[in-house]
Amino acid sequence: MGRPVGQTNQAQPSVQHTASPSNKVSHNGGIGKPANIPTGIPVNYQQTQNQWSSQLFDCMNDSENAVITLIAPCVTFGQIAEIVDEGATPCATAGLLYGALFFTGASFVYSYMFRARIRKKFGLPDAPAPDWITHLVCMPFALCQEYRELKHHGFDPILGWAGNVQQAQQQEMMTPPTGQRMMG
């Protein structure tokens, strides 16, 4: 039997669709994107548990961030929240909310949830204590550790989400293609 015109003998890539509990239904009636679709910056989601790239009290590994966090923890938290939320929560909004909660003594209730999301995203252990305890007792150290962890995974929290996406796209454009040959 012959092949229709235009068809080649090359194997076609197979696409496997799996149902995922992370698919979200948006309130506007459409289906939201699954959480496992890339959103600009590739991140390795691993099921095995990794270790934090630095210890909780290693704040002087990034002394500039340690000083900023000591003086204005709301700035560091805002930067972390914007990256973890993939730009959905701007740094200023998260920082102001954190600052307001800080003066009530309840900022740990808001901030520990972002630590949990970082742990989940990078497969990190709930150590040295549960997230809420770490943020309640060691808040500035926890924020510094989370900031360093994001940097370890290639994010620059100072740039914000959009800046990190733009930087990743520029690096991708600068990377030469591999495995291509000239056909003659």
UniProtKB/Swiss-Prot annotation:
Major place of residence: membrane
Keyword Transmembrane helix set for record: yes
GO-annotated cellular components: membrane
One Pfam family this sequence matches: PLAC8
Keywords: Membrane, Transmembrane, Transmembrane helix
Domain of life: Eukaryota
Subcellular location: Membrane
Cystines in this chain: none
Classification via InterPro entries: PLAC_motif_containing
Compositionally biased residues, Polar residues: 1-26
Record function comment: May be involved in heavy metals transport.
This protein's name: Protein PLANT CADMIUM RESISTANCE 5
Species for this entry: Arabidopsis thaliana
Gene: PCR5
